[in-house]
Each structure stands twice: as C-alpha cells, then as structure tokens.
Amino acid sequence: MVLPTVAIVGRPNVGKSTLFNRIAGERISIVEDVEGVTRDRIYTTGEWLNRKFSLIDTGGIDDVDAPFMEQIKHQADIAMTEADVIVFVVSGKEGVTDADEYVSLILYKTNKPVILAVNKVDNPEMRNDIYDFYSLGLGDPYPLSSVHGIGTGDILDAIVENLPVEEENENPDIIRFSLIGRPNVGKSSLINAILGEDRVIASPVAGTTRDAIDTNFVDSQGQEYTMIDTAGMRKSGKVYENTEKYSVMRSMRAIDRSDVVLMVINAEEGIREYDKRIAGFAHEAGKGIIIVVNKWDTIEKDSHTVSQWEADIRDNFQFLSYAPIIFVSAETKQRLHKLPDMIKRISESQNKRIPSAVLNDVIMDAIAINPTPTDKGKRLKIFYATQVAVKPPTFVVFVNEEELMHFSYLRFLENQIREAFVFEGTPINLIARKRK
C-alpha cells in the first residue's frame, strides 16, 4: 500500500526538524540552534490513530549555498509536487515574516491541505500572539512547542483528518519493483532495455527523466510485474541542479511501494556515499534487494575484475550481505534477461512462510553446533521460535531472558535460518522475546 506523504515546510530555524523528530518518536535529524543544519535523515514513517504516513523534513533538502528565498521556494515546490498534506511551520517568537508571507502565497495556490503550525509557543502568555498568523490566509493556526511536545497531538490530529482516504490493497499477485540510485547511473536506459521499447526519455544528462512512471509487463511464465522508475525531479519543466537531494525523496516513495528494489550502481563512477544511503533506506524498509552494476560494457576488465568489484561492494554494503550482485549493460543488454527471474525468486523469499515445527528443528540443530551463550553464570535458554510476518520474513524467538541474547548469537541464528530455508535477497528479522 502506498503511504500518503506529509511534508514539513518552513524557513530555517523555526523548528521543522524538532517537530519531525517528535512525530517520528526519535532523534533522527541533526538538530542544532543554527540556521540550515538539518543535513541528515529527511524521511521517515509516522503513525497516529492507526494511520501511517511518510514524513518529509524539507529542510534536509535545502541547498545550503542557494539564496535564502530560493531555498524556501524549493521547499514549497517539493511540498506541492509530492505531499498529500503540508505542515507549514512558523515561529511564534518572531511573528509573521516576509518569508512566511511569501511561502503562504505559494501554498495558498495549491489545492492541498495546509496545517499552519506556530512553533516556539513555549508558555501560555504567547498564545495570544498566534492570532497574527491568520493574516497568512491558511486557516486556524495551531500553537506548538515542539521542544516540549506541547501541541504535537493537535498537529497530528489535523494531519490524520486531512490524509486521503486509504486505498484498497493492490493486487498481491503482481510483483512491484523499483530501480533506485544516483542520477545518471542508467536507470531509464535499464528500463528501456528491459521493456525493449523507449517508454522513458533516456539522456546522458543527469536528471532528465520527467516524472516517476509505472510500467506493467508480463514475463514468459505469465508473472505480472509493475516497474517503478524513480529518476528525476520535475517542477514546471525545470530540473534542479541538486538532483541527488531531490531524488532521495522520489526514491523513498518508490521504495515504499516496492516488493523488490534494484540498487543501480554506475560501473564508470564506482560506489558513492549516496549509493550507501539509499541502499540503507531500502534495507531498513525490509525490501528485497538486488545490487545491479550497470554500464559494465564501458570498463576494462581482466580475470580479477569481477571478484574485485564483488569484494568492494561487500565491503561498502556490509549490511546487504544477503543481496545478490549482477553486472549488466543497458547498452548491450548483457545479462538483463536474468533480472525478471531474480526479482521473482526474491519476491518468493520475501513471502516465504516456515512451519514452526521445521523452524524449531533448525534452531535446535543450530544450538547443537553453537551452544547458547552465558552471562555472569546464567545461560540463555531458547524455548521455541515462530514466524510472525512476511515481507520481510520475521521470527520471534522465545527465551528465558532477552538480555542474554547477544547480537552476535542472534546473527548466528539468522544465518542458520537463511541457509536452511534459502532466503535470497531479503533481510530477515529475528526478535528475542521473554516467554511469559
């Protein structure tokens, strides 16, 4: 199911990231009391009253070198293009500013719900000052102190009230996959080559894909697929120079919708920090993952090239040890015929269910190979395990004391389960829980 998107917009230093962290329930953006410091995680999942939504802190997408008004205009552009609900954060301490009026004019022209959050209302006396914000023409202002958590519930109530109606679940028989990666790694060319037709504009200039495009196709065995392209960021025909920053958000939305993610790397340029960041999002989301090295035809090779590349990938993506690697060329179509079958196998692994009796046989065999650890004379006891979810496969291991389950032993059990049941290309989760 596609999660609705909520974008937090506002000029620097009004508390966007603090509100983001409050809603997310954790400190995942870098927050300092200096303008423009949000440079870390900008995307997470929020939940309120049993409604889940994707949350974007647009401050994390600002170009620090861009002029001030251009930065906030970019934020508004992002919100208008991508968000279902916009939270416009202003400062109650500073009152209405020219920048606030500028953004409000842009947001007013959208047909999207805008929630006006007046932050830094840290004491009751300041509540009278929020009425000045009615002049922005965006409806009732909500007093908020995101530092103290006061008023956050009212903001969340308003968000949920304005979220679009939940869509019915998509056809579970269709495998949905996306191609993610830096601009100009060849995602569009890969799509064209897989489909055998020019469905997407492919150009050597980074960021030229005009919008995200879903394409459906059927393989020779009758399996249906939906392919999601994520390249580019469009607003009135203009592609921003900071394409990588904007493509992060587009990739996040595609990852949400995908069963399997193809992490595309440009063989000509090698692995970059951006690649690891995006791959980390896919891993944390529990998606099936294939590492696709594109433009393989363009580099010189010897008998050691493949093994050197594989070692480099494993070193840089240690958290993706389960992900298969394939070297392809969109230009020559080298190995592209293997991708649909790989995607299908990984989707099957994502949905695989293991009977409890069989699972516990593997757990007991694992304990026989490597006995459970002890801590201060007390030994970990494993009573039984059961699978509780798929996509990704998730198992609960019931024990005498959760604290005795060291991370290393949990990883050992995970590897034993993965090997026994051939979980290809998917993370699997093991959770230790005390038996009651």
Swiss-Prot record:
NCBIfam families: GTPase_EngA, small_GTP. PANTHER family: GTPASE DER. Keywords: GTP-binding, Nucleotide-binding, Repeat, Ribosome biogenesis. It comes from Streptococcus agalactiae serotype III (strain NEM316). Associates with the 50S ribosomal subunit. This is GTPase Der. GTP 2 binds at residues 181-188, 229-233, 294-297. GTP 1 binds at residues 10-17, 57-61, 119-122. The keyword Repeat applies. One of its GO terms (biological process) is ribosome biogenesis. SUPFAM superfamilies: P-loop containing nucleoside triphosphate hydrolases. Residues 4-167, 175-351 form the EngA-type G domain. Belongs to the TRAFAC class TrmE-Era-EngA-EngB-Septin-like GTPase superfamily. EngA (Der) GTPase family.
